[in-house]
Amino acid sequence: MSRQQPRASFLPESPLAPVALCDTTLRDGEQTAGVAFTRAEKRAIAEALQAAGVAEVEVGVPAMGEEERADIRAVAAVLKTAAPVVWCRLRAEDLAAAQRTGVVRLHIGVPVSERQISAKLGKDAAWVRDKVEKLVRAASWAGHKVSVGAEDASRADPFFLAEIAHVAAEAGAIRFRISDTLGVLDPFAAHELVGRVVTRCPLPVEFHGHNDLGMATANSLAAARAGASHLSVTVNGLGERAGNAALEEVAAALEAAGRATGVALGQLCALSELVARASGRPLSPQKPIVGEGVFTHECGIHVDGLMKDRATYESADLRPERFGRSHRIAIGKHSSAAGLARALAEAGLPADAATLAALMPALRDWAAITKRAAAPEDLAALLAAQTETAR
């Protein structure tokens, strides 16, 4: 008989177990170079996250000073169903600063790779173990709910990683976070790392992914598949360097996979637009889920298929209505004659065969020059120009 691997009691028995999303837009997202939120913006973002059903909101770093602590208190005051969380370094003074905010939940970031321990802290593994035990125990005794984050976990010794998880658990921590701080994992490595920790860690596991290789969303899904019960995200993927796993992408992908998140998908676009304005980071039209153009079709073959049966070019899990959106048919270089005829008719313009034959080449030239889709007024102008040329 084969021996079964030990299984933590919290490990989901079903691959469809729900996943809690922990948003860090107001902390890690604001660490994006050049991004800074006002207090009013922070409160508005926190309220929007709460309305969207996000489970936890990291609201700031108390050690930054009294102004930041005042912001944290103001933001925490509007959170009723979403739990506010503050972020601390592995320092007693950070814990003291956190206690002045009145926030119960706090997260302690712990460097766990040899490079970060020696170069950043100037310490060794024994010092880190001792510090984690003392600070987590002190915070727990003070009434805080403490999560511990393993920074640079993807480059850490796996045995030391497991050891820190056990030290944190014994000291009173409620969750253990695996941070791919440099964004170096791929989904296969993320699944392996998280799965290894989940089977050895006595705590629920959270995954925090960065997007340096463009795989933060995929890595987050792999982590959930491996047993992570919580995923760290930011709106629009804001974050240092290439950013973090995007809330809207992770929520949509998990729901499509049958994993409940508690997030109202129809709220994501408004939330995304709010953060885009507050951060000064406009969205790409092709940003998955929330970009202006992600439910727009121009290619004649695709448009023809959609008109006959939406399922030809649309997944049931990605119907625009799920996100409070609708389809848009764009007219441009790749439009078919039928699509152009439909657009002309809707604009009250002639759509006979002769008009289409004359207008199609002009439309393609116009699209190559203007680099955009044609609006009804553009079609009218093109038609007028063709009529004038024909005289």
Swiss-Prot record:
Keywords: Nitrogen fixation, Transferase. One of its GO terms (molecular function) is homocitrate synthase activity. Residues 19-269 form the Pyruvate carboxyltransferase domain. It catalyses: acetyl-CoA + 2-oxoglutarate + H2O = (2R)-homocitrate + CoA + H(+). SUPFAM superfamilies: Aldolase. One of its GO terms (biological process) is biosynthetic process. Its EC number is 2.3.3.14. It holds the Pfam family HMGL-like. Gene3D superfamilies: 1.10.238.260, Aldolase class I (3.20.20.70). InterPro entries: AIPM/Hcit_synth_CS (IPR002034), Aldolase_TIM (IPR013785), LeuA/HCS_post-cat (IPR054691), NifV/FrbC (IPR013477), PYR_CT (IPR000891). Signal peptide: none annotated. It is an enzyme of class 2 (transferase). This protein is a Fe-Mo-cofactor biosynthetic component. NCBIfam families: nifV_homocitr. PANTHER family: HOMOCITRATE SYNTHASE (PTHR42880), ISOPROPYLMALATE_HOMOCITRATE_CITRAMALATE SYNTHASE FAMILY PROTEIN (PTHR42880:SF1). Belongs to the alpha-IPM synthase/homocitrate synthase family. This is Homocitrate synthase. It comes from Cereibacter sphaeroides.
